[in-house]
């Protein structure tokens, strides 16, 4: 019975940790990542379609992304969608593909992204604490239903707290690593 509470808590905490890592991928480091274009949608035959489903998106070097559409007629639409996304660069259409040239990041931008990473970490910690509350409620329900004794409940609360502390540590480590990566020139 308690194992199902622990398993659900661990599963939910892993989801929160993975969501944090996904959020981190949207932060620009010293080199560009194609993930910055992940949330851009293009009008494709009257449907809003993810950019990566209508074009090949490649990071050609540390500061350039190339977007080559599978249909040449898509060039203008892709260029407009990227411009409208307001990601901090102006797309350049060379007739074959759309190129994005990212300027090197300033120290100020790096510090700003490090702050964002810290805020994302805090948000993830709040999620972990809410998951702990749900797990504790599950233990409380089992105790109320007389499925477990008071001593077992006490041990269960301690185990729930251990799991929470473990995931908070993992989040702190992930934030620390991301901050180091962001601030490294």
UniProtKB/Swiss-Prot annotation:
Subcellular location(s) per record: Cytoplasm
Gene3D superfamilies given in the database record: 3.30.1360.40, Ribosome-recycling factor
One example of a Gene Ontology biological process annotation: cytoplasmic translational termination
Keyword Transferase (UniProt): no
CDD domains: RRF
Signal peptide, first to last residue: none
Location (main, coarse): cytoplasm
GO cellular component: cytosol
Gene Ontology molecular function: any one: ribosomal large subunit binding
Keywords: Cytoplasm, Protein biosynthesis
Purpose: Responsible for the release of ribosomes from messenger RNA at the termination of protein biosynthesis. May increase the efficiency of translation by recycling ribosomes from one round of translation to another.
UniProt similarity note: Belongs to the RRF family.
Protein name: Ribosome-recycling factor
Source species taxonomy: Bacteria, Pseudomonadati, Campylobacterota, Epsilonproteobacteria, Campylobacterales
Gene coding for it: frr
């Amino acid at each position: 019975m308690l194992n199902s509470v622990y398993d659900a808590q661990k599963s939910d905490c892993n989801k929160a940790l993975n969501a944090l890592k996904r959020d981190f991928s949207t932060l620009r480091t010293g080199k560009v990542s194609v993930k910055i274009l992940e949330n851009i949608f293009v009008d494709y035959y009257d449907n809003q379609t993810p950019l990566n489903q209508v074009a090949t998106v490649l990071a050609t070097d540390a500061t350039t992304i190339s977007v080559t559409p599978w249909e040449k007629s898509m060039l203008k639409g892709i260029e407009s969608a990227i411009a409208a996304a307001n990601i901090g660069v102006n797309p350049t259409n060379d007739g074959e593909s759309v190129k994005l040239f990212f300027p090197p990041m300033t120290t100020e931008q790096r510090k700003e992204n490090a702050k964002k990473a810290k805020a994302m970490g805090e948000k993830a910690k709040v999620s972990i604490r809410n998951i702990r509350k749900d797990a504790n409620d599950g233990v409380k329900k089992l105790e109320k239903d007389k499925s477990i004794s008071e001593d077992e409940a006490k041990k269960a609360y301690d185990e729930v707290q251990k799991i929470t502390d473990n995931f908070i540590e993992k989040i702190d480590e992930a934030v620390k690593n991301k901050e180091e990566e962001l601030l490294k020139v």
